[in-house]
Amino acid sequence: MEIILANPRGFCAGVERAIAIVERALEKFGAPIYVRHEVVHNKFVCDDLRAKGAVFVEELDEVPAGSTVIFSAHGVSKAVREDAEARGLKVFDATCPLVTKVHVEVGKMRNQTREVVMIGHKGHPEVEGTMGQSQGGMYLVETADEVAQLQVSDPLHLSFVTQTTLSVDDATVVIDALKQRFPEIQGPKKDDICYATQNRQDAVKELAGKCDLVLVVGSPNSSNSRRLKEVAVGRNVMAFLIDDAEEIEESWLRGKQHIGVTAGASAPETLVERVVMHIQALTGASVTHLKGIEEGISFPLPKDLN
């Protein structure tokens, strides 16, 4: 049996930055440091930060006035920012710069009096943050079927943006449907789906062609991790999304010769290592690393935390 590791996998630059912001704030200001929403969607990461003194909350009214709060990598609405300022909170923004780019795009589009269609998953915090960049003039769609039902005020002045962690293939289908229904619609100058999402999905496509089972390390509330599983399944390969090695069922491994392993952008490499060791303990499998893109991207921390 062979374990094949996808490349790239695991942490992206936005996740590394978000985690570093929480850790640096704890070092500089001490516990507790409040974080609005899970800073990244990974149970292992959040449990580790919680043990160090981070307190995760869903709404700012859970944060005592005058405290330090960090916005998660997924971004927040303008209303949340205004609320934080009104309550005198010291804010550090861990929003991924690639999500911020989408927020800026929405602002420019609305300033041009264009309505904006966002392609994304309803209820996801990134979508809520991006939709909250404008009071009105925005629509949310997830599928081509929803595009067919969409009614807008002015089809001639319409733009679209996307959630950064979508399936590239699924997003393309929805974008094509938008362009067919609204021929004058305009998109961003550069694709909103982030480099890490694209690279990890491409790596899984390669991996799926070499494996009869794919394990995606990531939490179930991680959008990009779920998309990786979907990409593998779309290549007609059995795939499972797991938080940690202990979730692996031995029955999955029976009769398999090549087991692919990857990780979502919010999953640390230590979890991948646990999965590899667990499979090796059960099967004695060898390990092969696929070649892939060397990303080499990093984002700076806020000045006050340097």
From Swiss-Prot:
<feature type="binding site">
    <location>
        <position position="224"/>
    </location>
    <ligand>
        <name>isopentenyl diphosphate</name>
    </ligand>
</feature>
<feature type="binding site">
    <location>
        <position position="194"/>
    </location>
    <ligand>
        <name>[4Fe-4S] cluster</name>
    </ligand>
</feature>
<protein>
    <recommendedName>
        <fullName>4-hydroxy-3-methylbut-2-enyl diphosphate reductase</fullName>
        <ecNumber>1.17.7.4</ecNumber>
    </recommendedName>
</protein>
<dbReference type="GO" id="GO:0046872">
    <property type="term" value="F:metal ion binding"/>
</dbReference>
<feature type="binding site">
    <location>
        <position position="266"/>
    </location>
    <ligand>
        <name>(2E)-4-hydroxy-3-methylbut-2-enyl diphosphate</name>
    </ligand>
</feature>
<feature type="binding site">
    <location>
        <position position="74"/>
    </location>
    <ligand>
        <name>(2E)-4-hydroxy-3-methylbut-2-enyl diphosphate</name>
    </ligand>
</feature>
<feature type="binding site">
    <location>
        <position position="124"/>
    </location>
    <ligand>
        <name>dimethylallyl diphosphate</name>
    </ligand>
</feature>
<feature type="binding site">
    <location>
        <position position="41"/>
    </location>
    <ligand>
        <name>dimethylallyl diphosphate</name>
    </ligand>
</feature>
<feature type="active site" description="Proton donor">
    <location>
        <position position="126"/>
    </location>
</feature>
<dbReference type="GO" id="GO:0051745">
    <property type="term" value="F:4-hydroxy-3-methylbut-2-enyl diphosphate reductase activity"/>
</dbReference>
<comment type="similarity">
    <text>Belongs to the IspH family.</text>
</comment>
<comment type="function">
    <text>Catalyzes the conversion of 1-hydroxy-2-methyl-2-(E)-butenyl 4-diphosphate (HMBPP) into a mixture of isopentenyl diphosphate (IPP) and dimethylallyl diphosphate (DMAPP). Acts in the terminal step of the DOXP/MEP pathway for isoprenoid precursor biosynthesis.</text>
</comment>
<feature type="binding site">
    <location>
        <position position="96"/>
    </location>
    <ligand>
        <name>[4Fe-4S] cluster</name>
    </ligand>
</feature>
<keyword id="KW-0408">Iron</keyword>
<comment type="pathway">
    <text>Isoprenoid biosynthesis; dimethylallyl diphosphate biosynthesis; dimethylallyl diphosphate from (2E)-4-hydroxy-3-methylbutenyl diphosphate: step 1/1.</text>
</comment>
<feature type="binding site">
    <location>
        <position position="224"/>
    </location>
    <ligand>
        <name>dimethylallyl diphosphate</name>
    </ligand>
</feature>
<keyword id="KW-0004">4Fe-4S</keyword>
<feature type="binding site">
    <location>
        <position position="74"/>
    </location>
    <ligand>
        <name>isopentenyl diphosphate</name>
    </ligand>
</feature>
<feature type="binding site">
    <location>
        <position position="223"/>
    </location>
    <ligand>
        <name>dimethylallyl diphosphate</name>
    </ligand>
</feature>
<feature type="binding site">
    <location>
        <position position="222"/>
    </location>
    <ligand>
        <name>dimethylallyl diphosphate</name>
    </ligand>
</feature>
<dbReference type="GO" id="GO:0051539">
    <property type="term" value="F:4 iron, 4 sulfur cluster binding"/>
</dbReference>
<feature type="binding site">
    <location>
        <position position="224"/>
    </location>
    <ligand>
        <name>(2E)-4-hydroxy-3-methylbut-2-enyl diphosphate</name>
    </ligand>
</feature>
<dbReference type="GO" id="GO:0016114">
    <property type="term" value="P:terpenoid biosynthetic process"/>
</dbReference>
<comment type="pathway">
    <text>Isoprenoid biosynthesis; isopentenyl diphosphate biosynthesis via DXP pathway; isopentenyl diphosphate from 1-deoxy-D-xylulose 5-phosphate: step 6/6.</text>
</comment>
<feature type="binding site">
    <location>
        <position position="12"/>
    </location>
    <ligand>
        <name>[4Fe-4S] cluster</name>
    </ligand>
</feature>
<feature type="binding site">
    <location>
        <position position="74"/>
    </location>
    <ligand>
        <name>dimethylallyl diphosphate</name>
    </ligand>
</feature>
<feature type="binding site">
    <location>
        <position position="222"/>
    </location>
    <ligand>
        <name>(2E)-4-hydroxy-3-methylbut-2-enyl diphosphate</name>
    </ligand>
</feature>
<feature type="binding site">
    <location>
        <position position="41"/>
    </location>
    <ligand>
        <name>(2E)-4-hydroxy-3-methylbut-2-enyl diphosphate</name>
    </ligand>
</feature>
<dbReference type="InterPro" id="IPR003451">
    <property type="entry name" value="LytB/IspH"/>
</dbReference>
<feature type="binding site">
    <location>
        <position position="124"/>
    </location>
    <ligand>
        <name>(2E)-4-hydroxy-3-methylbut-2-enyl diphosphate</name>
    </ligand>
</feature>
<feature type="binding site">
    <location>
        <position position="124"/>
    </location>
    <ligand>
        <name>isopentenyl diphosphate</name>
    </ligand>
</feature>
<dbReference type="GO" id="GO:0050992">
    <property type="term" value="P:dimethylallyl diphosphate biosynthetic process"/>
</dbReference>
<keyword id="KW-0560">Oxidoreductase</keyword>
<feature type="binding site">
    <location>
        <position position="266"/>
    </location>
    <ligand>
        <name>dimethylallyl diphosphate</name>
    </ligand>
</feature>
<keyword id="KW-0411">Iron-sulfur</keyword>
<feature type="binding site">
    <location>
        <position position="223"/>
    </location>
    <ligand>
        <name>isopentenyl diphosphate</name>
    </ligand>
</feature>
<keyword id="KW-0414">Isoprene biosynthesis</keyword>
<feature type="binding site">
    <location>
        <position position="266"/>
    </location>
    <ligand>
        <name>isopentenyl diphosphate</name>
    </ligand>
</feature>
<feature type="binding site">
    <location>
        <position position="222"/>
    </location>
    <ligand>
        <name>isopentenyl diphosphate</name>
    </ligand>
</feature>
<feature type="binding site">
    <location>
        <position position="223"/>
    </location>
    <ligand>
        <name>(2E)-4-hydroxy-3-methylbut-2-enyl diphosphate</name>
    </ligand>
</feature>
<dbReference type="Pfam" id="PF02401">
    <property type="entry name" value="LYTB"/>
</dbReference>
<dbReference type="GO" id="GO:0019288">
    <property type="term" value="P:isopentenyl diphosphate biosynthetic process, methylerythritol 4-phosphate pathway"/>
</dbReference>
